[in-house]
């Protein structure tokens, strides 16, 4: 479980 991946999906959602 990597937090970086979570932020990656969060940025997409934000877009």
From Swiss-Prot:
Note: On the 2D-gel the determined pI of this protein is: 7.0, its MW is: 10.7 kDa.
Subcellular location(s) of the protein: Secreted
Name of the featured protein: Bacteriocin BAC-IB17
Keywords attached to this entry: Antibiotic, Antimicrobial, Bacteriocin, Secreted
Keyword Kinase: no
One GO cellular component term: extracellular region
Top-rank taxon: Bacteria
Chief subcellular location: secreted
GO biological process annotation, one example: killing of cells of another organism
Function statement: Has bactericidal activity against Gram-positive bacteria M.luteus, methicillin-resistant S.aureus, methicillin-sensitive S.aureus and B.stearothermophilus as well as against the Gram-negative bacteria E.coli and S.typhi.
Keyword Isomerase part of the UniProt annotation: no
